Amino acid sequence: MRVSSALLQKAAKTVDKYSLYVPKSGVFPKGFKVASLASGVKKNGNRDLGIILNTNKSRPSNAAAVFTTNRFKAAPVLVSKQVLDGSSGEGVNAIVANSGCANAVTGELGMQDAQKVAGQVNAHIGKENSTLVMSTGVIGQRLQMDKISKGINTLFDQKQFGSDFNSWLNLAKSICTTDTFPKLISSKFQLSDGTEYTLTGISKGAGMICPNMATLLGFIVTDLPIKASTLQAMLTAAVNRSFNCISVDGDMSTNDTICMLANGAVDTFVIDEASPDFEQVKSQVTEFAKQLAQLVVRDGEGATKFVTVNVKNSANFKDARIIAETISNSMLVKSALYGQDANWGRILCAIGYSKLENLASLDESKINVSFIATDNSSPRELKLIANGVPQFDIDENRASEILALPDLEILVDMGTGSEECQFWTCDLSHEYVTINGDYRS
């Protein structure tokens, strides 16, 4: 039995995502301090300006970033790319981010504004070409430079930087727009010799989520010493398995950026691609990035479900990814998930029109499709298609139970190889239209 849309909307609104996903404490990398405030850019008076600083005096931090491939790249994206290109990722000691205004499609004046923001932070820390700039908010509006400039000066002049939990949480809040909760995670890890290091991640995003070689806005910082070129390779690999595998609505922003700073405050050898711990650290960063990316989907605008789309036993990874992404972006699939309708035909249709690189990846006689319950209830797997044959006698009651879960999985077994890709998506509700229908107001 399907639940009425009115009840579904009510359920979505009553889920307290803040309590579920926002930590109450954390561990943070050595040698970083952060600050944030309400500069007045946001109409609601919430925090809208934040800065991350490397305060490790013994070593400048290295940086890496992955940016949107949208042709209308925002001014802060272009300025940050210039900083990284000019420094080769070395000696980048700060990130400044604002919310409420994207500074996108603002022409040469927008570029000048972004450069002034970076230059102002550079002047405060006494280093040139050392600051990355990030912005999020409404496209087509210039930064209110008087408010941003005053806010930056206030943070430095009043020495508002801290390394405690509240400082980091407030930083996460300062980049939120339509987010229902700030996204902050942190964890300690060990190298093979027992040396401990820390990763902290912050991201924002709830809509305009369908990245390609980038993400929404996100920072990952660590106190490990990592060679700049290695850091870039590590971040790119992590993003390809995390932030490039999420979808809320199929839209790719003009401002999508994820960056990583490594300041070497932990006293250990510099990690490069020849280091014995390289693969371990790379794997840890990737798994950490997956956790951070999944929070964005959990906060999808109006979403009531978090859905893992798992495509396995594919002839190659690229086609597994293409199929997972196509299912995740399908408005019909997402609408069926919201309505708790076991309409497997929409899933199969999405698989069928996927633009595969190798047609041999899809053999209609070998494909299996299932719904998977994630709450340990039984039966865990509900088979919808078995070796290309529809299961006409599926248990509709069990299907409704699985589709009513806040977390569930769509499993697609291609039967043509051994490669696997996971995508994370959400359903599409009436609330999504409401939120985006009056975003500028």
Curated annotation (Swiss-Prot):
Which cysteine pairs make disulfide bonds?
Answer: none
This molecule's function is given as: Catalyzes two activities which are involved in the cyclic version of arginine biosynthesis: the synthesis of acetylglutamate from glutamate and acetyl-CoA, and of ornithine by transacetylation between acetylornithine and glutamate.
Q: Which InterPro entries match?
A: Arg_biosynth_ArgJ, ArgJ-like_dom_sf, ArgJ_beta_C
Catalytic reaction(s) noted: N(2)-acetyl-L-ornithine + L-glutamate = N-acetyl-L-glutamate + L-ornithine; L-glutamate + acetyl-CoA = N-acetyl-L-glutamate + CoA + H(+)
Give compartment(s). Mitochondrion matrix
Q: What else is known?
A: This protein may be expected to contain an N-terminal transit peptide but none has been predicted.
* Record site feature (Cleavage), residues: 214-215
Q: Which UniProt keywords apply?
A: Acyltransferase, Amino-acid biosynthesis, Arginine biosynthesis, Autocatalytic cleavage, Mitochondrion, Multifunctional enzyme, Transferase
UniProt cross-references to HAMAP family, sorted A to Z: ArgJ (MF_01106)
Q: Name one Pfam family in it.
A: ArgJ
The name of this protein is Arginine biosynthesis bifunctional protein ArgJ, mitochondrial
Pathway assigned to this chain's UniProt record: Amino-acid biosynthesis; L-arginine biosynthesis; L-ornithine and N-acetyl-L-glutamate from L-glutamate and N(2)-acetyl-L-ornithine (cyclic): step 1/1; Amino-acid biosynthesis; L-arginine biosynthesis; N(2)-acetyl-L-ornithine from L-glutamate: step 1/4
PTM info: The alpha and beta chains are autoproteolytically processed from a single precursor protein within the mitochondrion.
* Coiled coil regions in record: none
Query: What is annotated as the active site?
Result: 215
Q: Where is the signal peptide?
A: none
